[in-house]
Structures are given as structure tokens and as C-alpha cells.
Regions:
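Conserved active-site neighborhood of enzyme catalytic/cofactor-binding cores
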Residues: 20, 64-95, 197, 328, ...
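Catalytic alpha/beta core of large soluble enzyme barrels
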Residues: 80, 93, 285-384, 389-390, ...
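N-terminal cofactor/phosphate-binding cores enriched in small/glycine residues
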Residues: 46, 55-120, 127-128
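Conserved oxyanion/phosphate-binding beta-strand-loop segments in alpha/beta enzyme cores
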Residues: 24-60, 88-97, 121-128, 232, ...
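Residue patterns forming the tRNA-binding/recognition surfaces of aminoacyl-tRNA synthetases
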Residues: 26, 34-35, 39-43, 47, ...
Length: 748
């Protein structure tokens, strides 16, 4: 749309009498914002007439925490609203909904802390945060609102689980899981950060429990390969790629000397097999205890117990390697040499096979371990074929010539690395293998406040899904909702709810008492917004085809390997069963930076540095806060909050208001200089907007306004065309963007 046409259609008219009257008084944000907010509620500007192309701009919906929103939350919401208005003024019908991620640990922990039932505290918190979000003056469509705790919503969360169960993607397994002793529940690997619970920061331990799992590994290749087609920050794509961790190598079988057992290892460097001088097993390996001899048994059992109390993260980060010799040996299948079998907690049971062959000459960790425990080191790759005398560190160069490797001597390691898997397979003691760091998703939680898992346990039929026409399985009311810590959720104590009949055979059976994690609803909620009142389908195919997927998704980078990965998994599954015709949920992703307290410290109640928007709106107004949130720095970068900044923005708004007020009734002719300034603003701001440089859009508008103030003083006034450009959007009406929403509307 050309600049002239936008200005003609949208710019305020300076000669309008009511506008001149409103402008006559000094800028009073309370009066202005109250008036125009009511006007917008009565006359929405984002209406679907069925003729416009859609643009779906979505925020990551919030947890309804008791502390409400702080200015850091506001930043993402302001950014998304600016972008939504920009698209709206370019002729799109903008889908811009909001909802509540209200099940799970955050809401339940708050309820327990305050002694209030989570249903009550969650409803209260939602009401408070909704009020705060409405204060942003954003164009959210509240008719699309969703709440993950609404039975009409979680009916479909349960439906997805049933479909996954029928597809073989949901299964039950007893296994050692991450256990938070404070939250008293199991955690997925993605919920453990630096060895601690990502919610309460308690040190995570291990606990053997029967768990429901989702087979996200079945989608590992697609999740990894499809990253290439996403317009996402490279940082996020790399984080997901590293988390999935696909590697190519071989599985090799080592027979245990003197026993009818073998140990399978996974290695990405089968070319170095001649250099394998010892083996290390994870303490949790199924053979760990049985490999102990009479002489080593006590030390082995003590080491296994000690390792069980430590998190995987702690084990991987330890600089000091620990271990214990089992007393047993394995046979290197390539050269027949005996290699000692050790246990060490730097090997993880859930990666590869839980056992590794150790080539200390060419791996830093193995070298350190060998030096500490005086194990042999044999170099098998050398630069130019020359062996290093008295190695002081591992030779880890990727390329070199094979030495001390029998028939493989003289081969280039880079070539042998590719050929060795097939050679080993032909020799009969191994096979080619693609491996992944990604593990299946631990999906059940031993908590109350979550979606009941729709499974019935029948003594005869086994695990049976609740029939789809009987969904939702409602979360029952309880008196005691606190976690038990026993490995069972509080639901297990409700006999009248637990005891039921099997849908298959009609005999007495019991309901599953674990609940789903907080990520269950958020993995698909973005689909429901566009058809949130549909009682028969998760989303109709007609609306899915018309309004989905999400075009722009805005939220924090902290969800890179949690929500964002899970949402991609769910979307691919729903695509595969025909619910939607796309397999990626979010076409473009923008991660806004964090607003921190002083000295870059993250805002939190415990630090006492949370800045609430409520008082700022009262003192400075919504527009001043919105503008400062944009001005504070590049939107993708972290920024430190400074109260002096919003004070300066508020003073600037007053100067702008005065500029228009003083010139509203003047019939001043435009000059070459004002035309030049106006056109330059349009060009600069448009370019910056398209590049998402929102902070420089604001600074450019400030610069533009200051030039007009100086020019007004110099030549005695500013012409109407220039004022209309400025007044409409505070960043030029020809940009079709409305940064300072209520002030802009006031100036119409």
C-alpha cells in the first residue's frame, strides 16, 4: 500500500473539532487511556470479514503464577502486539489470542505454599494476570481464550494421549528416573538443569518407578532434519540439534572372559578398536553387580550406591573422574586382548548401551581416567604415521594414519572411520548403528494438579485406554492434594475414583493415578485457539487449513528443548493421523531478551528485584511503559531495567503532545525541509520495522519529533500533513504501525 493512500485512509484530520478540543489540555494519560480503551472494546479494530489473508501472531501463554506479571513478561507481549498491529495495518486479519497454561508444577506449588486449593488459586491468579494483560492495550482476541484446566480443553489433551497409545507411542516402563525430592515427582531429562529441578532448584536424585513414556525417539530423525526448514534463531536450532544428538558409528560386542556374557558398546570411532585398552560401564548397567569378584564386591556395591544419589548433570560435569575395577575382563574382539572392566559414573546408562570401550590415546576423558588408574595407553592414529613418545595428552585430531592396528596399519583414519562399521559387521562381532542422545519422554507425574492419564489397568486385559466417547476423564476433587512422596499421586487415595470397570471385559479394574506433566497442554494449545468451542473435534480440518500454522511465535529461549521440542513432536504426530496438514507448528520464532534487575540479575521474588507494571501504569501510563519496553534495547538482547528510562519516555510523550497541540490550529504551509524529514522517517522506520529493530524504530521517532520541535520554533509552525503523519502513529502513519496505542487513538 502506497504511503499516500495509507495517510489518506488512516491519518487523523487536524481540522477535526473534537480532536482539537481533546488536544487543548496537557497530556493526562489516565484520562486518555480510560477513554480510548473503552472505545476499542466497543469497536474492535481487528475483525475477520472473511476476505483478508490471515496472519497468526502468538505469544507463549503464561503460567498463572501468584506473583502476576512483571515488566519482563510485558516485553514479549508488547513486541507481539506491535507486530500484530503492523500486520493488521497491512491488510491482514490477525489471529492474536491469549490463554492460560494452568496445570502442572508452577500452579500446584503456589497453591501448596499458600494453603489454597489449586483450582481456587489458579482461577484467582488468572483473573489478576488477565487484568494486567488487558492493561497493555493489546489487540488480543479474548473470544479465542483457552485454559488447559478446562475439561473441554483437556478432553483433547487426553484424546491425543489415547491416539498415541493406540499408535504404540505411549507405553509404561519401570526405570530409574530423575526425582525431585522437593516437588516429590519424577522429571523429564529436559526438566533437569545443571543437576537441579528447573522449577524449585532442588538437587535431583534417581528413583526407580513405573512411568508412562512417550516415544519421542520415533520422531528423532524428522525432528532433527526438519530444523533446516524453520525460520528460527540458529541458537535454538542448534540447541535442539545437540539435544537430539544424532551420531553414526557401530555397536561392538565384547565377550566377558570366563563367562557366558557379552557387553555391547556403541562407538562413533570403530576405527580405533585396536586402541581400546579398557571398558567402562555405567554403575546402573545390568551386569555391573554380577561382574564383581569376591575381592571387589564391596567396593563395587558401595560405588553403585554412591552413584545412584547423583544426577546425570553432576556426573558429566565432574572434573575429577572416579571409578572402581570390577575384577572382570572382556576380550577385544579384533585382537583378542583382555581389557579390564571398570565402573564409572561419567558413563550414563541411558546413552548408547550404558557401556563404552575406552581408547585413552585419542579421548580426553579416557586419557585422564587411564592416567589416574594406571591403565595402558596405545596410540593407533598418528600424524604422518609417527607415534608420539611419552604422551602427555590425548591425540584428538580427526585425521591421521593408522598405527598399531594390525591389518589396518597405513590406512587413513578418516576413511577407516566410514568403512569400519561394515567391516566389523562382516567379521560378525558388531553392526552399523545410528545413535541419539534424545531419550523417550518421561510423561507421568506423581502429582494432583494435572490431566488424568486416560488409562485403565485391568488384571486380564492389561493397560486399556479410556474409550474416546468417555473423555474427558475428569480430575476429581480432593481434600489432600499435596504430593505424597511415595511414588503415587494423591489420586491413588480416592477409592471411588480409582475403582472402575474395564472397557474391554467389564471386570473390576483401576484407573491410572499419575497425571500428565505441565507440558501436555502447551504442546498443542496453539491449535485450539482457532476452534476453541468445537465439542466434536480438537480442531476442524476446515479451520486448521484456513488459520494454521502459527506464522510468528514469540517467547523466551528457555523453552528451546522443552516446550518447543515437544510442540514439534505433537504437531508431527497430529499431522500423521490427519488432524492437520502441516508438520511444524511455528513458521517463524522470535526469542525476546530478558528484562533483568540491577547488575543483570534475573527478576525474582526471592531476589526482591521484581518490577510490577501496575504502579508504572498508574504513574506513567500504558503508552510510556510500552514505549520504554521497546526502547530499552534490541528486542532479542537482555536489558537491565532502569526507572529513569521510563521517566524520560514519559517526558518525551509530553513534548510530543505539546508539539501537536501548539500547531493543531495553524494553517502552516509545508516546506521542503518538513517534506524531507517526513519522507526520511517513513523510509527509516519501515526498514527498521521489517528488520525487527524495534528499539531503533522508537529512537528514530524520537529523533524525528525533536527535529520537528526545533523546526517549529525556527519557522513558526508545522504543516498539517506532517502533523497528521506524526499524530497517527507516533512513528508516522504511513508505516501503518501503532506503537503507542491509546495515545495514537487519542490523536485521531
Amino acid at each position: 500500500m502506497c504511503c499516500a493512500r495509507i495517510r489518506a485512509e488512516a491519518a487523523p484530520k487536524i481540522q477535526d473539532a473534537a480532536w482539537r478540543l481533546d488536544m487543548a489540555a496537557a497530556y493526562n494519560h489516565k484520562v486518555v487511556e480510560k477513554k480510548w480503551r473503552g472505545n476499542w472494546e466497543a469497536h474492535p479494530i481487528n475483525v475477520n470479514d472473511g476476505k483478508k489473508p490471515k496472519y497468526y501472531c502468538l505469544d507463549m501463554f503464561p503460567y498463572p503464577s501468584g506473583s502476576g506479571l512483571h515488566v519482563g513478561h510485558w516485553r514479549g507481549y508488547v513486541i507481539s502486539d506491535v507486530w500484530s498491529r503492523y500486520k493488521l495495518m497491512h491488510g491482514y486479519y490477525v489471529i492474536h489470542p491469549m490463554g492460560w497454561d494452568a496445570f502442572g508444577l508452577p500452579a500446584e506449588n503456589y497453591a501448596i505454599k499458600n494453603g489454597v486449593h489449586p483450582r481456587i488459586s489458579t482461577a484467582s491468579n488468572i483473573a489478576n494476570i488477565k487484568r494486567q494483560i488487558q492493561d497493555i492495550s493489546a489487540i488480543y482476541d479474548w473470544d479465542m481464550e483457552v485454559n488447559t484446566t478446562d475439561p473441554e480443553f483437556y478432553k483433547w489433551t487426553q484424546w491425543i494421549f489415547v491416539k498415541m497409545f493406540k499408535a504404540g507411542l505411549a507405553y509404561e516402563k519401570e526405570m530409574p528416573i530423575n526425582w525431585c525430592p522437593s516437588c516429590k515427582t519424577g522429571l523429564a531429562n529436559e526438566e533437569v538443569v545443571n543437576g537441579c529441578c528447573e522449577r524449585c532448584h532442588s538437587v535431583v536424585t534417581k528413583k526407580d518407578l513405573k512411568q508412562w513414556m512417550l516415544k519421542i525417539t520415533a520422531y528423532a530423525d524428522r525432528l532433527l532434519d526438519d530444523l533446516d526448514k524453520l525460520d528460527w534463531p540458529e541458537k535454538v536450532k542448534k540447541m535442539q540439534g545437540d539435544w537430539i544428538g544424532r551420531s553414526y558409528g557401530a555397536e561392538v560386542d565384547f565377550k566377558v572372559d570366563g563367562k557366558d556374557e557379552s557387553i555391547t558398546v556403541y562407538t562413533t570411532r570403530p576405527d580405533t578398536l585396536h586402541g581400546a585398552t579398557f571398558m567402562v560401564l555405567a554403575p546402573e548397567h545390568k551386569l555391573a553387580k554380577s561382574l564383581a569378584t569376591d575381592e571387589t564386591r564391596k567396593d563395587v556395591e558401595d560405588y553403585i550406591f554412591k552413584a545412584s544419589t547423583r544426577s546425570n548433570i553432576d556426573r558429566m560435569q565432574d572434573k575429577e573422574k572416579t571409578g572402581v575395577f570390577t575384577g572382570s575382563y572382556a576380550i577385544n574382539p579384533l585382537n583378542g586382548k583382555k581389557v579390564p572392566i571398570w565402573l564409572s559414573d561419567y558413563v550414563l546408562a541411558d546413552y548408547g548401551t550404558g557401556a563404552i570401550m575406552c581408547v585413552p590415546a585419542h579421548d580426553d576423558r579416557d586419557f585422564e581416567f587411564a592416567k589416574k588408574f594406571n591403565l595402558p595407553i596405545i596410540q593407533v592414529i598418528a600424524k604422518d604415521g609417527k607415534e608420539i613418545e611419552n604422551m602427555t595428552e590425548a591425540y584428538t585430531e580427526a585425521a591421521g594414519t593408522m598405527i598399531n592396528s594390525g591389518d589396518w596399519n597405513g590406512m587413513e583414519s578418516s576413511v577407516l572411520k566410514k568403512e569400519a562399521p561394515e567391516m566389523i559387521e562382516k567379521m560378525g562381532f558388531g553392526k552399523k548403528k545410528v545413535n541419539y542422545k534424545l531419550r523417550d519422554w518421561v510423561f507421568s507425574r506423581q502429582r494432583y494438579w494435572g490431566e488424568p492419564i486416560p488409562i485403565i489397568h485391568c488384571p486380564d486385559c492389561g493397560c486399556v485406554p479410556v474409550p474416546e466417547d468417555q473423555l474427558p476423564v475428569l480430575l476429581p476433587e480432593v481434600e489432600k492434594y499435596e504430593p505424597t512422596g511415595t511414588g503415587e499421586s494423591p489420586l491413588a487415595a480416592i477409592d471411588e475414583w480409582v475403582n472402575t470397570t474395564c472397557p474391554c471385559c467389564g471386570k473390576p479394574a483401576k484407573r491410572e493415578t499419575n497425571t500428565m506433566p505441565q507440558w501436555a497442554g502447551s504442546s498443542w494449545y496453539f491449535l485450539r485457539y482457532v476452534d476453541n468451542k468445537n465439542k466434536d473435534e480438537l480442531v476442524s480440518r476446515e479451520k486448521a487449513d484456513k488459520y494454521l500454522p502459527v506464522d510468528m511465535y514469540i517467547g523466551g529461549v528457555e523453552h528451546a528443548v522443552l516446550h518447543l521440542l515437544y510442540s514439534r513432536f505433537y504437531t508431527k504426530f497430529l499431522h500423521d493421523i490427519g488432524v492437520v496438514d502441516f508438520d511444524e507448528p511455528f513458521t517463524k520464532l522470535f526469542n525476546q531478551g530478558m528484562i533483568t534487575g540491577k547488575n543483570g540479575i534475573k527478576m525474582s521474588k526471592s531476589m526482591g528485584n521484581v518490577v510490577s507494571p501496575d504502579d508504572l501504569i498508574e504513574d506513567y501510563g500504558c503508552d510510556a511503559l510500552r514505549m520504554y519496553e521497546l526502547f530499552v534495547g534490541p528486542p532479542e538482547m537482555d536489558a537491565e531495567w532502569d526507572d529513569r528510562g521510563i521517566d524520560g519516555v514519559r517526558r518525551f510523550l509530553g513534548r510530543f503532545w505539546n508539539l501537536v497541540t501548539e500547531n493543531a490550529d495553524k494553517n502552516f504551509a509545508e516546506t521542503a525541509e518538513t517534506v524531507k524529514i517526513r519522507h526520511k522517517l517513513v523510509y527509516d522506520i519501515t526498514t527498521r520495522l521489517e528488520n525487527f529493530n524495534l528499539n531503533t524504530v522508537v529512537s528514530g521517532f524520537m529523533e524525528y519529533t525533536n527535529k520537528l520541535i526545533d523546526l517549529s520554533k525556527k519557522q513558526g509552525g508545522i504543516d498539517k500533513a506532517t502533523l497528521e503523519t506524526a499524530a497517527f502513529s507516533k512513528a508516522a502513519s504511513t508505516l501503518a504501525i501503532n506503537f503507542l496505542t491509546s495515545t495514537s487513538a487519542k490523536l485521531k
